[in-house]
Amino acid sequence: MTQIKLLLLSLAITAQSITYDLPSQWDHQWLTQQPLGSDTTCTTSHLTAFQMSKTKDPIFFSTGGTDPFLSPKMLPLNSTAGEQWEFDGVSPDAKMAFVFGFYRDPNYAILGSGNLRVSVEMLWPNGTRFAQVDYPTDSVIEECEWGTRGVWRADEFSYSFEVSRDLQTARVAMHTPQVTGVVYLDSESKPRYPDGKIYPSETSTSEALPYFHFVEPIPVAKSQVDLMILGESYVWSDGVGGMERLWGAFSWFTCLQGMNVVRLHAGPYALSLLSFTSNIKKGNEYPSIALFENGEPVFSSQRTEDSDTADYFTFTKTYDGKVTGTLRDKVTGYELELVSPGEKKHWTFIIDHESLAFEYILGGGHGGSGFAGFVQGGRVGLEQFRGIALTEALTFPKKSPLFRSQYSETS
């Protein structure tokens, strides 16, 4: 544990080339405190790679309300439920991007590596991509008065994230044979539920669609990156990024047919969109969007049908741009329309892909493609702004040799 503390301290020192204001407690408490789990004012969740429930008794499963966004959403793990802490970002020139996933998820245990996983994907300016997946021996989530820290580790590597209590600041640190360094996020938004309400809300649920949940601790943020990848510097400032929490009672393959994600920042505007297509309620769409202006919420909706009274939005994939992926869906961008009849306000944002940031192939032309791009938009009739965006388009195949649906009407 002392080695991990020293590692985090050394990573903070190496990142001094980026000027960044961290919560004052972090360096005092987390970088010099006693080992993880020793502070009685903190709550600790420790899970090893093969640790899970040995019975069919019900487990704790979070469904929203005032449950802290960073807390584990299920304890203990069972054979179907899994969760993810996800961070992503894109550089200001839309030529570099990252996506990191911290997993407690038994659905990949069929590979023989246990229930813990960390995935790292980065886009280089020349268009090549770096990816690695590590399988930790254990993970620790420590929730303290000043924030939450997670560590996924094994003897040969460690990954960590730290998020301030107000969910406005985050940093991710990693030390592996191939990648070392730190990523920072500084929120341009407020933590939100699928219904658009701001955390905490006693009346909100995290269920975005049947058996699948999300919340966004950091919907949109400024991103700064200071990494070394295979001995080469990987650095940017003033990018865009964010953090999501995703979890489900069953696997993604069981719950989802598809997903679309947009995260953008343009002028005073920050926007987050997630739209899911259900595999349990076949083909039903479950969209959610939130718009922030100067960090404050100004629009949110789950409605995509026109209305004379209720706020609604539309999002349309475009296919006439210059950059697409290798999968069947050749999307090159998105067009977003947000309408508030009551406020007599209307916003539009048009995104064009600039780079293919990441891609994972699930067979038959299906899978996920993530893009870095540029956005132009703002309130109709007023000044328009140019900015950067990160998007993802995901479709699942109807059948897979690796995964089977875990749901039945008697589940």
From Swiss-Prot:
Keyword field: Isomerase, Signal
Q: Which Pfam families does UniProt cross-reference here?
A: DA_C (PF22903), DA_N (PF24137)
Extract the signal peptide range.
1-17
RNA-binding as UniProt keyword: no
GO molecular function list: isomerase activity
Claim: Hydrolase is one of the keywords in the record? no
Name of the top EC class for this enzyme = isomerase
Q: What is its EC number?
A: 5.5.1.-
The pathway it acts in is: Mycotoxin biosynthesis
List the residue ranges forming a coiled coil, or say none: none
What the protein does comes down to:
Diels-Alderase; part of the gene cluster that mediates the biosynthesis of the cytotoxic leucine-containing cytochalasans, including aspochalasin C, aspochalasin E, TMC-169, flavichalasine F, aspergillin PZ, aspochalasin M and flavichalasine G. The first step in the pathway is catalyzed by the hybrid PKS-NRPS ffsA that utilizes 8 units of malonyl-CoA to iteratively assemble the octaketide chain before addition of L-leucine by the C-terminal NRPS modules. Because ffsA lacks a designated enoylreductase (ER) domain, the required activity is provided the enoyl reductase fssC.
Family to which the UniProt record says this protein belongs:
Belongs to the Diels-Alderase family.
- What is the protein's name according to its record? Diels-Alderase ffsF
Q: Which organism is it from?
A: Aspergillus flavipes
